[in-house]
Amino acid sequence: MASDPFVHQDLGESVLVSESRLGRLQMVVRSTGYAFLADEPRSVGGLGSGPDPYGLLAGALGACTAMTIRLYAERQGWPLERVQVSVQHHRASLEARDLFERSIYLEGPLDEAQRTRLMEIAERCPVHKTLDRGSDIRTSLTPVMAQAAAEGAGSEHMRDMEQAGI
C-alpha cells in the first residue's frame, strides 16, 4: 500500500506545503485546518502573493512573542490593552548567524516593573527558544502524497486571492 503513489499520507499535526501551480514559486501552506500563500517577490520570479520563507519565520517569531506576552499579562491580571511585535531578519552572509530584531510595543497603563517583566517574558516564547538554540532537521523522501495536497485546494480560491491583491 505504501508504494502506491495515489495512497495518501495522513497529515496529523504536520504543516503541508504544496505548489499552487498558479505561479512558479507560489506555495499553499496548510496547517491545522488553515491555508495561506507563501511566495517570493516578483524581483526573484515569484508573484509576490504572500510572505517569503524568511517572512514566515519572522512572522512565527512575532506571533509567538505577542501570544506569550498576552497570555502572561492575562494570567497576572495586568492592564495590557494591546501588544504589537515587529520583526526584521538580517543575514550578512551565508556563513554568518542570522539576526532577528524584535521591537515590542506594549499599550496600556502598565508600570515600569510590568513592562520590564513582559520584555523578559518575550525571551521565553517557544519559537524564540527554538531559534536561539538551533534545531536538527531530518529529511526523507516519501513515495506517498499527503492528503491535503491531493485535494486540489481550490485553484479558484487562489485566483480570487491573487485578484484581490491578498
Feature names for model-found ranges:
Residues C64-T65:
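Alpha-helical metal-binding/catalytic segments enriched in His/Glu/Asp
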Residues M1-G59, R70-I166:
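Extended beta-strand/beta-hairpin segments
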